[in-house]
Amino acid sequence: MVAKQRIRMANEKHSKNITQRGNVAKTSRNAPEEKASVGPWLLALFIFVVCGSAIFQIIQSIRMGM
């Protein structure tokens, strides 16, 4: 008897899931904007490394060219 009840509950849950597919709750639809996941210091470090390596590469290519 318990197994039949479990199967019935699973069938109801599955059919409810099928009928509500595509319906998004209003709370998750109008979520506020999230902050950037990267902090300003980490962003500054990343820009420093990228620009510094580009400048270093330019200087190195000028030295090798002469």
Swiss-Prot record:
GO biological process: endoplasmic reticulum unfolded protein response; glucose metabolic process; insulin secretion; muscle organ morphogenesis; plasma membrane organization; positive regulation of growth hormone secretion; positive regulation of insulin secretion; positive regulation of organ growth
Alphabetical keyword list: Endoplasmic reticulum, Membrane, Protein transport, Translocation, Transmembrane, Transmembrane helix, Transport, Unfolded protein response
Bilayer topology term: Single-pass membrane protein
Chief location of this protein within or outside the cell: membrane
Cellular compartments per GO CC: cytoplasmic microtubule; cytosol; endoplasmic reticulum; endoplasmic reticulum membrane; ribosome
Keyword Transport annotated: yes
Residues spanning the membrane: 39-59
Covalent S-S links between cysteines: none
Subcellular localization(s) per the UniProt record: Membrane; Endoplasmic reticulum membrane
Pfam families, A to Z: RAMP4 (PF06624)
InterPro entries for this protein: ER_stress-assoc (IPR010580)
Extent of Polar residues compositional bias: 17-30
Annotated segments matching region Disordered: 1-31
Function as written in the Swiss-Prot or TrEMBL entry: Interacts with target proteins during their translocation into the lumen of the endoplasmic reticulum. Protects unfolded target proteins against degradation during ER stress. May facilitate glycosylation of target proteins after termination of ER stress. May modulate the use of N-glycosylation sites on target proteins.
Quaternary structure annotation from Swiss-Prot or TrEMBL: Interacts with SEC61B, SEC61A1 and the SEC61 complex. Interacts with CANX.
Family label: Belongs to the RAMP4 family.
Name the record gives this protein: Stress-associated endoplasmic reticulum protein 1
Species of provenance: Homo sapiens (Human)
Native organism taxonomy: Eukaryota, Metazoa, Chordata, Craniata, Vertebrata
